Design a protein with these regions (language model features):
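Aromatic/acidic polysaccharide-binding cleft in carbohydrate-active enzymes
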Residues: 1-63
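Acidic/polar loop patches that form or flank catalytic/metal-binding clefts of enzymes
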Residues: 11-17, 72-80
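Extended hydrophobic-aromatic, low-complexity segments
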Residues: 25-26, 77, 99, 107-112
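Amphipathic heptad-repeat coiled-coil/leucine-zipper-like oligomerization helices
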Residues: 53-56, 70, 102-104
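Short, surface-exposed beta-strand/loop micro-motifs that present aromatic residues
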Residues: 83-92
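Short, well-ordered beta-strand segments enriched in hydrophobic/aromatic residues
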Residues: 94-103
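C-terminal beta-sandwich/jelly-roll accessory domains of carbohydrate-active enzymes
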Residues: 102-296
Length: 296
């Protein structure tokens, strides 16, 4: 979830993982003298009364802190063609941190474009944490001279790459991100009925744009409506972040729809029409990321 929080860093004061200390209050006869599930430390001799505990050891929750403990710096612009791969990057003097997370239930191929680093790479520190449903998490770290241009990231795996550079890198451009919220929300979806949303006073330029369409619908109806922005049709992707939610009674999620930045005007009209009835469009957000110079 941390990569999702980092996407909203400008809207958070603080975010803290739900991890407690050793929670000695839970080690009682009623609980079979077993530790609380969300603890960072557990007894080395589990199942013993509190007075008989001989020492404390880390639980697997320590891996979260091992994975992220060195990451810091100023945010670097990143993008991904695969919505199931979350990515964040931060630059701190001679260290570039790139974090990747796989939301899909199967391994995903990753191809990193870091050509701008050139021969400035001294080495790369690799950290990986994979969480399994029926087994202990797997954590490892290593330092390598290089990594393949293409590699796979496992389901539920998070990778943090630290590119250790020979000389510091400087920013040559700045990206400004702005979210514009529609005034209409929780709109009932009716077959072939056009839902219209207005976005005014939008600042455009070089960069990228997208629509965040949040919907709640039954599984047997469409998730891909006809979408027009200022009269021009834009493609709705077949894939979105995460899984299909087939184990739930209904689908409820946000589908990101890429929009060519050239279509964005100061005042914009978005029209959405589904081929079938049922459910609601809960909200629609226009995301615009612009820069003074074109993003390479």
């Amino acid at each position: 979830m941390i990569l999702g929080w980092l996407d909203r860093q400008d809207r958070f004061e603080i975010s803290i993982p739900f991890t407690v200390d050793n929670a000695t209050w839970h080690i009682t006869k009623q609980n079979d003298y077993l530790p609380y599930k969300a603890v960072l430390w557990r007894p080395e001799n589990m199942g013993a009364p509190l007075k008989d505990i001989t020492g404390w050891v880390y639980t697997n929750r320590i891996h979260f802190y091992q994975l992220w403990k060195d990451v810091k710096g100023k945010r670097v612009f990143t993008s991904t063609a695969n919505p199931d791969i979350q990515v964040q990057a931060f630059l701190d003097d001679k260290h570039l941190y790139v974090a990747l997370n796989n939301l899909d239930e199967s391994p995903q191929q990753v191809s990193l474009d870091v050509a701008s680093l050139g021969v400035n790479i001294q080495n790369i520190s690799v950290k990986s944490l994979t969480v399994f449903q029926e087994d202990f998490p797997r954590y490892y770290e290593d330092t390598v001279p290089s990594i393949p241009s293409e590699f796979y990231i496992e389901a539920a795996e998070t990778i943090v790459l630290a590119y250790n550079l020979k000389t510091p890198m400087a920013f040559k451009n700045q990206v400004n991100a702005k979210r514009y919220y529609s005034t209409g929300f929780l709109v009932p979806i009716e077959a072939h009925n056009e839902m219209t949303f207005e976005f005014k006073n939008v600042k455009s330029g070089h960069g990228f744009a997208s629509l965040s369409m949040s919907i709640g619908r039954n599984h047997d109806v469409s998730k891909r409506p006809n979408v027009l922005i200022n009269g021009t049709k834009v493609a709705v992707p077949f894939n979105w972040k995460g899984y299909d939610q087939a184990n739930r009674k209904k689908f409820f999620g946000t589908i990101e729809i890429p929009v060519p930045i050239a279509l964005i005007k100061e005042n914009n009209t978005v029209s959405i029409r589904f081929p079938d009835s049922g459910g609601h469009l809960s909200s629609l957000i226009l995301n615009v990321e612009t820069s003074k110079k074109p993003i390479q």
